[in-house]
């Protein structure tokens, strides 16, 4: 989860988040190198005493500053397309979970497990030993290291189901069903929030996921049934 004065990404807990962070680091390195080169050229032009008033064109320079950006864009393009494909491609999910957005809470359904369903509301942040605006009365429980399919929609306005540590952000749109892969690498509790302004209590729509062992997940399912 995010902490005060945190400028980096949250600790990754999915393979998609790992890929996104690696891609971000690569793009940032390219941006830093381009910015450094640009600043150096500008300073050099201002500080050197040489000038050529008759230099009107240089085909070699024009070829270089056309080809190099094309190469850089291709270097950025292919990893980006690969990550987009991996996130959107649903490959043999073990089961599906449906997430339904409401103003201003989430509902969850487990169709393959006797159609378990429950609502998830934010807890009063005045209670002690809880994270402000992040704790919910019912957690979405998933087994770790097992590929799942998340299906999301909405009953009223557009919401966005977002869990940064899992590298997930998908819009919940009324009358439309969106889906994506969901997999957790290790056990823990992970927090997210609605990331689409959806009305007065938009800030009070937390998402709380508990990732646990498969045996514990089955025990939880039996208790819900």
From Swiss-Prot:
Binds a dinuclear copper A center per subunit. GO terms for cellular component: mitochondrial inner membrane. This is Cytochrome c oxidase subunit 2. The keyword Transmembrane applies. Cu cation A1 binds at residues 159, 194, 198, 205. Belongs to the cytochrome c oxidase subunit 2 family. Component of the cytochrome c oxidase, the last enzyme in the mitochondrial electron transport chain which drives oxidative phosphorylation. The respiratory chain contains 3 multisubunit complexes succinate dehydrogenase (complex II, CII), ubiquinol-cytochrome c oxidoreductase (cytochrome b-c1 complex, complex III, CIII) and cytochrome c oxidase (complex IV, CIV), that cooperate to transfer electrons derived from NADH and succinate to molecular oxygen, creating an electrochemical gradient over the inner membrane that drives transmembrane transport and the ATP synthase. It is found in: Mitochondrion inner membrane. Mg(2+) binds at residue 196. It is an enzyme of class 7 (translocase). Pfam families: COX2, COX2_TM. It catalyses: 4 Fe(II)-[cytochrome c] + O2 + 8 H(+)(in) = 4 Fe(III)-[cytochrome c] + 2 H2O + 4 H(+)(out). Component of the cytochrome c oxidase (complex IV, CIV), a multisubunit enzyme composed of a catalytic core of 3 subunits and several supernumerary subunits. The complex exists as a monomer or a dimer and forms supercomplexes (SCs) in the inner mitochondrial membrane with ubiquinol-cytochrome c oxidoreductase (cytochrome b-c1 complex, complex III, CIII). It is a multi-pass membrane protein. Residues 1-25, 83-225 are mitochondrial intermembrane. It comes from Apis mellifera ligustica.
